[in-house]
């Protein structure tokens, strides 16, 4: 691989060099969020050049509460470990890390308590919350409690898990983003209840206890968003299919000979 690629590092403020690279590339890939995309797009490409962009995205997690209620202690600990990998490894900053947790089923209250308490015990051994992050996290909680109109209740499981239970999902729910173990929650009976909120900013849906066939039917129901549906624990697994784009094909020139 080393012989096939060149890596160039320069200051991001160097617009002239960004302009030069844009003018000679066949394909420009911008991976850095919506703000970065807007900044770089001011530099034109060649007429036949193409572009792949990876903008800011929003992800969510779906849990079947009845299945969690029936889990034995070993399997529950394994589940929270996988959830930890999806969320806390990058402090919820990854585009595929969930911010919104959906609880499906009638036994959600008991399952919620069981899940979060088990995760809290795991975090005490694994996760170190910086002092500044702790302050910012609490400040965000205070702001949400005061300003959110769809706020129902809040709960803290130590200082490492903050949850805010919502009484409804607004169409701009993708603006509700947490860090360092800050999650928004909502209870549902079926997936049709969240169809109206899914826009093209939604990327990854992680799940546990829900039949794959049910999820396939849901995401194929003319949704504008959700490009990935993976089990809990696989949110950060990168592949050549990302953000709904087949990257390998997008970077390949096809010569048609008949």
Label each PLM-derived region with a short phrase.
Residues 1-88:
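Rossmann-like NAD(P) dinucleotide-binding subdomain of oxidoreductase/dehydrogenase enzymes
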Residues 32, 209, 233:
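Residues that line or immediately flank small-molecule/substrate-binding pockets and catalytic motifs
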Residues 81, 90-203, 213-257:
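NAD(P)-dependent aldehyde/semialdehyde dehydrogenase
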Residues 29-31, 60-64, 100-102, 184, ...:
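Structural motif
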Residues 35, 55-60, 67, 100-107, ...:
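Glycine-rich beta-alpha junction loops
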């Amino acid at each position: 691989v080393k012989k096939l690629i060149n890596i160039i590092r320069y200051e991001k403020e160097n617009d002239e060099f960004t302009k030069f690279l844009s003018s000679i590339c066949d394909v420009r890939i911008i991976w850095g969020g919506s703000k970065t995309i807007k900044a770089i797009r001011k530099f034109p490409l060649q007429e036949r050049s193409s572009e792949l962009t990876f903008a800011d995205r929003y992800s969510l997690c779906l849990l079947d509460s009845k299945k969690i209620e029936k889990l034995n202690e070993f399997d529950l600990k394994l589940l929270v470990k996988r959830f930890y990998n999806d969320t806390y490894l990058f402090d919820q900053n990854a585009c595929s890390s969930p911010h919104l947790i959906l609880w499906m089923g009638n036994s959600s209250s008991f399952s919620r308590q069981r899940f979060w308490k088990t995760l809290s015990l795991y975090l005490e051994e694994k996760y170190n919350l910086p002092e500044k992050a702790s302050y910012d996290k609490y400040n965000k909680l205070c702001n949400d409690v005061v300003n959110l109109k769809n706020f129902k209740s809040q709960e803290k499981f130590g200082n490492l898990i903050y949850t805010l239970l919502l009484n409804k999902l607004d169409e701009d729910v993708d603006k509700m983003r947490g860090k360092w173990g800050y999650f928004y929650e909502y209870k549902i009976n079926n997936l049709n209840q969240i169809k109206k909120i899914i826009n093209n900013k939604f990327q990854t849906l992680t799940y546990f206890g829900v039949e794959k066939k049910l999820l396939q039917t849901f995401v194929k129901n003319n949704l504008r968003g959700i490009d990935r549906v993976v089990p809990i624990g696989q949110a950060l697994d990168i592949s050549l299919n990302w953000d709904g784009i087949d990257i390998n094909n997008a970077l390949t020139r096809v010569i048609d000979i008949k």
